[in-house]
């Protein structure tokens, strides 16, 4: 049975990747269908109730700069906001928000329901329709076929999902939801490498049974940060505190005593878990010398008693979970509302994807989110936006687009995945970006919004606000560069008390701002140097661009040099066995990864600069040197 309408793009899955994919495609004018097994769970935060953090917050800002929904929803749902690394340089500062699950889900659903060109339909997908190595459509659980020339698959942890609590296990996509078995079996028939990964979640605790007086209170920042570039503090709901407590030696003894019934330590779970979000069992095992581990007690919302104890993700049996929770200070009488569990699921090797996130094997089929081996809402949302955008571009007969590593953390994410692949759930960090001084949270809009507008992702309201901010920055920078102060100027008497060394030569206002003892607000507070621009984000940008201009230019020079190699394309049918001088190890790795460009090849582990030089010489001799599209 065929559905009575055809679509341009079909998105399968309504999590963070799926919602951003569907919204991106629809914003670009493509007739889009979002298929989900349950419309009520669209935008569900399946694990921790938080958005942002180191590296992750950068991705959220980039999603926002390209017109996405995640930051906007966070501003309307965030019940505690903090800027991490606030005492460090701007490159590693990151915004993190504790979110009310219900408010976040409601805002995402509101955005979806009001998006032109987007249809929602509740049905699980069981099969793909493929012909001549091209996707044609999907078939749902009830045998209903939907047709579209582009499909974005965002199945999360649902593909052959198996939930583990102790030595007991059962099939599930997440607690309370069925897995996608038929779809997983169908995907395993495709010529794409498949593996198993694992993630986990902690038990949820009843707040009424916690003694918060025995814990350390952690308040949000004041003034409150805002996640979206078009957001406002007025969007935020009521703000509340989180709390901090710790495990202890008794906790660790309880965990060690239960390891014989742990699915991870008894060989029941095959999948590899996230290195940077380990279970409490892993922490006790890997860091045996530590006598305690920090636990963040995070509220799940304003109108619920559920608490998320961040730091004790576990799949131990329920009796062990209860004992370990009650061994922790402040939770001696705690009651568990939902047990913690581990979930094992299929993922597909992202090296089998183009950097547009289209599969190399099946035209028109795009993968985004945990299906590509990543972990985290932010990583999923960023991939979803890119996949939905490129699906729409393909349908429109336009060229695919993906930012370079020097343009966005999204570019770093996709390049890492498609070039290097991953054997464990991939999480974004600022340390993964070699050009992180340019890839800051604060300038994500300046880096990406103009491109987003060109692609059709950015609406008129966001575009107008962006242009006003950009113009304010440029005008203020011009003013600071063009205004001078002389040693004999009457302004000097007001300025010198703020300086470590008095002015002895004439200088521009820009040169004054470069002094370490001055910041933009302080300089503008001195009589004769104002007025300051009113937009605080624009003012922050002025200060950063002035103070870091030398470092920024140096990094830009490095990028220009790297781009020359980055754009040198490699033929997909190139037989590396025929390249004289390459070692067997290098040949094997190049044949395995099949990089699209010399830049990608250079980032494969074990590929030396000498090997790249040999490759370039071979390409030149054979007349195969070409620039990538």
UniProtKB/Swiss-Prot annotation:
Keyword annotations: Cytoplasm, FAD, Flavoprotein, NAD, tRNA processing
InterPro entries xrefs: FAD/NAD-bd_sf (IPR036188), GIDA_C_N (IPR049312), MnmG (IPR004416), MnmG-rel (IPR002218), MnmG-rel_CS (IPR020595), MnmG_C (IPR026904), MnmG_C_subdom (IPR047001), MnmG_C_subdom_sf (IPR044920)
Location in the cell: Cytoplasm
SUPFAM superfamilies (UniProt xref): FAD/NAD(P)-binding domain
SMART domains per the UniProt record, alphabetical: GIDA_assoc_3
Parts of the chain that traverse the membrane: none
Domain of life: Bacteria
HAMAP family: MnmG_GidA
GO molecular function (one): flavin adenine dinucleotide binding
Residues annotated as binding NAD(+): 273-287
Subunit comment: Homodimer. Heterotetramer of two MnmE and two MnmG subunits.
Binding positions (FAD): 13-18, 125, 180, 370
Cofactor(s) this protein requires: FAD
Official protein name in the record: tRNA uridine 5-carboxymethylaminomethyl modification enzyme MnmG
Biological function: NAD-binding protein involved in the addition of a carboxymethylaminomethyl (cmnm) group at the wobble position (U34) of certain tRNAs, forming tRNA-cmnm(5)s(2)U34.
One GO CC annotation: cytosol
Gene Ontology biological-process annotations: tRNA methylation; tRNA wobble uridine modification
Entry's family note: Belongs to the MnmG family.
Organism, as annotated: Shewanella loihica (strain ATCC BAA-1088 / PV-4)
């Amino acid at each position: 049975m065929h559905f009575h309408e055809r679509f341009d793009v079909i998105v399968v899955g309504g999590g963070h990747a799926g919602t951003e994919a569907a919204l991106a495609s629809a914003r670009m004018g493509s007739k889009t269908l979002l298929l989900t097994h349950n419309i009520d769970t669209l935008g569900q935060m399946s694990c921790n109730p938080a958005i942002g953090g180191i590296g992750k917050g950068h991705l959220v800002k980039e999603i926002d700069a390209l017109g996405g929904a995640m930051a906007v929803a966070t501003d309307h749902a965030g019940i505690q906001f903090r800027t991490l690394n606030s005492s460090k340089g701007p490159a590693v500062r990151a915004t993190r928000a504790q979110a009310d699950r219900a408010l976040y889900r409601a805002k995402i659903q509101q955005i979806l329901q009001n998006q032109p060109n987007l249809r929602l339909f509740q049905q699980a997908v069981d099969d793909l329709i493929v012909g001549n190595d091209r996707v044609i459509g999907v078939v749902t659980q009830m045998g209903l076929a939907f047709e579209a020339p582009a499909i974005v698959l965002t199945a999360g942890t649902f593909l052959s999902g198996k939930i583990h609590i102790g030595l007991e296990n059962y099939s599930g996509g997440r607690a309370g939801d069925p897995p996608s078995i038929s779809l997983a079996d169908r995907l395993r028939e495709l010529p794409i490498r498949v593996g198993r990964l694992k993630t986990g979640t902690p038990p949820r605790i009843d707040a009424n049974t916690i003694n918060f007086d025995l814990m350390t209170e952690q308040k949000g920042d004041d003034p409150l940060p805002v996640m979206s570039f078009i957001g406002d503090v007025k969007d935020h709901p009521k703000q509340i505190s989180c709390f901090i407590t710790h495990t202890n030696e008794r906790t660790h003894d309880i965990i060690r005593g239960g390891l014989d019934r742990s699915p991870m330590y008894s060989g029941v779970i095959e999948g590899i878990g996230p290195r940077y979000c380990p279970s409490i069992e892993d922490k006790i095992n890997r860091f045996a010398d530590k006598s305690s581990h920090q636990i963040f007690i995070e509220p799940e919302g304003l109108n619920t008693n559920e608490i998320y104890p961040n730091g004790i993700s576990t799949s131990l049996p329920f009796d062990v979970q209860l004992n370990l929770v009650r061994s922790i200070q402040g939770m001696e009488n705690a009651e568990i509302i939902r047990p913690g569990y581990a979930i094992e699921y299929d993922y597909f090797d992202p090296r089998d994807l183009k950097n547009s996130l289209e599969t190399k094997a099946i035209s028109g089929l795009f993968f985004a989110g945990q299906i590509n081996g990543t972990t985290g809402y932010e990583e999923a949302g960023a991939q979803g936006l890119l996949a939905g955008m490129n699906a729409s571009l393909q349908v429109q007969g336009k060229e695919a687009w993906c930012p370079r590593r020097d343009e966005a953390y999204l570019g770093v994410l996709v390049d890492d995945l498609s070039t290097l692949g991953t054997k464990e759930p991939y999480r974004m960090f600022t340390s993964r970006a070699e050009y992180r001084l340019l890839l800051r949270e604060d300038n994500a809009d300046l880096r990406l919004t103009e491109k987003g507008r060109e692609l059709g992702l950015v609406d008129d309201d966001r575009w107008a606000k962006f242009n006003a901010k950009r113009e304010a920055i440029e005008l203020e920078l011009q003013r600071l560069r063009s205004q001078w102060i002389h040693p004999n100027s009457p302004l000097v008497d007001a300025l010198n008390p703020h300086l470590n060394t008095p002015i002895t030569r004439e200088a521009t206002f820009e040169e004054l701002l470069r002094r370490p003892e001055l910041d933009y607000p302080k300089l503008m507070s001195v009589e004769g140097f104002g007025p300051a621009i009113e937009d605080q984000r624009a003012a922050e940008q002025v200060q950063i661009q002035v103070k870091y201009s030398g470092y920024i230019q140096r990094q830009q020079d490095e990028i220009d040099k790297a781009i020359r190699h980055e754009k040198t394309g490699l033929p997909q049918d190139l037989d590396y066995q025929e390249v004289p001088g390459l070692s067997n190890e290098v040949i094997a790795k190049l044949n395995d990864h099949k990089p699209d460009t010399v830049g990608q090849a250079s980032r494969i582990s074990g590929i030396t600069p000498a090997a790249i030089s040999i490759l370039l010489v071979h390409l030149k001799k054979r007349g195969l040197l070409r620039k990538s599209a």
